[in-house]
């Protein structure tokens, strides 16, 4: 194609070297149109990709959309299906890494799944717990358990269990394995639990605007609901079990504590959760990132500033 373009350029230069007439200009326009159409045809059609039998050794041709969907939800993998809920706002670089990585990881383990990116699009401070509540309510009847999963934490050990946690909540990113947080009551990062158990806790508190502390409150909810917490065993990779891709220098977390939030952060919210969650789904978008399907749920949270004035920074 590039050789053809050079020939066309030489023809055009020679063509213009003589006397310029309206017919020559018309002919030149036609040549340019034909060259443009040829370029468009080659760049937009599948002709520029390798045939199926000419892909490099070990590399399969791209999967079709139907293939991608079936690869995420193969009924032969078992009766349970995971809703991987990712609370999200503006971390697009991390998302581009996370979705293909997790889709491949779960496929390898034959975990039926769908990835839900709950994207906060309102003007309030980030509320991770409320977004996870939204993810639970919007996950559909085809899923029966949840993964509360941070977008910046990637599992590196194939022995980590993402299966159905029938006996109780399963903390994948346990304090013995998480690269940053090592206190005993930590339940953040990646936590699996059945929807039944999540409803028993009334979800997570909606009072935690800004970064942090919602996991500690949820730990107390698990205890109150009488649920036993399980963690991985036999994992020998220690703090190298996960790859933490958050760049603190580039994306600073909102850790400000304002008004009475400093006192509220250590209290248990006895009534809040799924039952008093207020939100609007602005739109749902089915996306494919490097061959991995996911659903983006653009969500506007609502805040009663009389109850939690710290949902905004003044």
What are these regions (language model features)?
Residues 90-93, 153-155:
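Short acidic, S/G/P-rich loop/turn micro-motifs used as interaction or catalytic elements
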Residues 33-37, 64-69, 97-100:
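Eukaryotic beta-rich interaction modules
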Residues 18, 123, 129, 136, ...:
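Conserved catalytic core of nucleotide-sugar-dependent glycosyltransferases
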Residues 80-83, 114, 217:
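Cell-envelope/extracellular polymer assembly enzymes that use nucleotide-activated donors
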Residues 83-91:
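A conserved hydrophobic helix/loop-capping motif in glycosyltransferases and polysaccharide synthases
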Residues 70-78:
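Short boundary motifs at domain starts and secondary-structure transition points
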Residues 92, 96-100, 107-143, 175-179:
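Active-site-proximal specificity loops/subdomain of glycosyltransferases
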Residues 2-46, 50-58, 207-210, 216-314:
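C-terminal catalytic/acceptor-binding lobe
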């Amino acid at each position: 194609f590039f050789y053809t373009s050079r020939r066309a350029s030489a023809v055009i230069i020679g063509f213009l070297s003589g006397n310029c007439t309206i017919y020559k200009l018309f002919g030149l326009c036609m040549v340019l149109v034909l060259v443009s159409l040829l370029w468009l045809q080659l760049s937009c059609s599948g002709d520029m990709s390798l045939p199926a039998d000419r892909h490099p050794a070990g590399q399969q041709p791209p999967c079709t959309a139907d293939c991608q969907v079936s690869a995420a939800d193969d009924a032969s993998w078992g009766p349970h299906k995971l809703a991987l809920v990712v609370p999200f706002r503006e971390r697009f670089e991390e998302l581009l890494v996370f979705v293909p990585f997790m889709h491949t990881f779960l496929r390898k383990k034959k975990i039926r799944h769908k990835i839900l990116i709950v994207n906060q699009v309102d003007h309030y401070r980030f509320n991770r717990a409320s977004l996870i509540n939204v993810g639970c309510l919007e996950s559909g009847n085809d899923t029966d358990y949840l993964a509360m999963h941070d977008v910046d934490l990637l599992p590196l050990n194939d022995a980590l269990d993402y299966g159905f946690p029938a006996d109780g909540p399963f903390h994948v990113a346990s304090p013995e394995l998480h690269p940053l947080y090592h206190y005993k009551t930590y339940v953040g990062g990646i936590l699996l639990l059945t929807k039944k158990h999540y409803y028993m806790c009334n979800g997570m508190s909606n009072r935690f605007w800004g970064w942090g502390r919602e996991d500690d409150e949820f730990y107390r909810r698990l205890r109150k609901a009488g649920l036993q917490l399980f963690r991985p065993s036999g994992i020998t990779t220690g703090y190298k079990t996960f790859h933490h891709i958050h760049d603190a220098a580039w994306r600073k977390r909102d850790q400000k504590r304002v008004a009475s939030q400093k006192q509220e952060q250590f209290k248990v919210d006895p009534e809040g959760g799924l039952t008093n969650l207020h939100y609007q789904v602005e739109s749902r978008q089915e996306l494919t990132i490097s061959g991995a399907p996911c659903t983006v749920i653009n969500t506007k949270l609502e805040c009663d500033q009389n109850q939690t004035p710290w949902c905004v920074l003044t």
